[in-house]
Curated annotation (Swiss-Prot):
Keywords: Ribonucleoprotein, Ribosomal protein. The lineage of its organism: Bacteria, Bacillati, Mycoplasmatota, Mycoplasmoidales, Metamycoplasmataceae. Residues 1-23 are annotated as: Disordered. It comes from Mesomycoplasma hyopneumoniae (strain 232). This is Large ribosomal subunit protein bL28. GO terms for cellular component: ribonucleoprotein complex; ribosome. It holds the Pfam family Ribosomal_L28.
Amino acid sequence: MARKDQISHRGPLSGNNRSHALNATKRKFNLNLQQITLKTASGKKIRLKVSAKTKKILRKWGHV
């Protein structure tokens, strides 16, 4: 599961680089992946790779 958010399942997006002459070359917009540790209801710790946006939402909901 490389370059994928393990909670929201979002992956990289594709687009173009644009020079001053407006030439277009393909590029990839990768997610800002972070590693977090969550506790399950049984007290077991699990490590997940999530995007910074997902981490921010989890912190807001009080899960991190």
